[in-house]
Amino acid sequence: MYQYHCLNPIAEVGLKNFNGNYAKTDKIEDADAVLVRSAVMHDMNLPEKLCVIGRAGAGVNNIPLGKCSEQGIAVFNTPGANANGVKELVIAGLLLASRDIVGGIHWVQSERQNEEIEKLAEKQKKQFAGGEIKGKKLGIIGLGAIGILVANAAVALGMEVYGYDPFISVEAAWKLSRDVHHTTDVNEIYRECDYITIHVPLMDSTKGMIGADAIALMKPSVVVLNFARGPLVDQKAIVEALKTNRIHKYVTDFPTTDLANLKNAIVIPHLGASTKESEDNCAVMAVKEIQDYLENGNIHNSVNYPNCDMGVCKDAMRVTIIHRNIPNMLTKFTAAFGDLGINIEKLTNVTRGEYGYVMIDLGNVADEEEIEKIRAIEGVLRVRTMK
């Protein structure tokens, strides 16, 4: 029996995927798995029993990845599960910024008691006029699950789309419209585009990537959109640019006091993935990843360990080992099982950065005392068994 703990409310449609071998617990110290959305885990004590954390969403900056990796805890996210919800809000952001829809709505509300509002609207509507996005240049920084959907939707709306992503995968590239101009120079996007939207993960290398230097290259008429992570855009630089009309507008899903007090900032209360469909998709995906890991040892969409899949074990026992990526580890594992007289039927070893992951299917069952000898090998972080 496996136990799971939810740090945030998780969509019931996802939790229903847990079968009778799973039970919900209110105590994290009893949990084999944790499901989380936005709860900050950095100051939490992670119990020894905990094997896996499933993030029902894409960003993992609320999870202590270093601590998890050292404790042998696999961390999964759900890339693409909320992509359509975010894409739709980005398109809405483009439209809100191109025409003063927000200002027009506020004006109507201010005149709601005026019996002449219908006639007055015809006189006042000019102040809320704007332009169309068709034919305008949209620059997309980051062509992952969300960036690709935004690019393809913008092409369908008649925009001239530029994409920048030096790390785009082959799989992602196949999904991208052939009408997207792929640039290898992000500065081309800063210089040429009328709208710029950012869709990259928050890392040390991307924090503040849209700052004073990038803004200096942009057109004064540019609209910058950020539905990825707040700190990707330098707060001080963007506020100064808005105050001095160095850029036209900033549309963001991450409210701050400074931005909320600027008329040329359109600030949304983090609604990007706040759709029922997104929450359901993320929950279902996270639960399935957790199940496959706990029951079969397979890793998909881990952010701290390498992906690895050997399907369902058809031999006597499966052993999985999380270890440091140092020389001779695989030799030590195979030698140890050989010394124990246990035959290895199948084996996969993959690495990612400082860590490695081994899946071994055995011809006969190893008892706990024999497994302890594997755990005792220097460099081993966690050993799990399943039948």
Regions found by a protein language model. Give the residues of each.
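Oxidoreductase and adenylate-handling cofactor-binding alpha/beta cores
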Residues: K87-H106, N152-M159, M285-N298, T334-G338
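N-terminal Rossmann-fold NAD(P) dinucleotide-binding loop
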Residues: G147-I148
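Phosphate-binding beta-alpha-beta segment of Rossmann-like dinucleotide-binding domains, i.e.
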Residues: P79-K137, N301-V303
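A conserved regulatory-domain signal marking ACT and ACT-like small-molecule sensing domains
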Residues: N304-K387
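Rossmann-like adenosine-cofactor binding region
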Residues: A39-M44, P166-D258, S274
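Rossmann-like dinucleotide-binding domain for NAD(H)/NADP(H)
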Residues: A212, P220-C313, Y357, D361, ...
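Glycine-rich Rossmann-fold phosphate-binding loop(s) that bind the pyrophosphate
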Residues: L143-G144
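An N-terminal-biased, well-structured beta-alpha scaffold segment characteristic
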Residues: M1-T78, G211-D213, L217, V223, ...
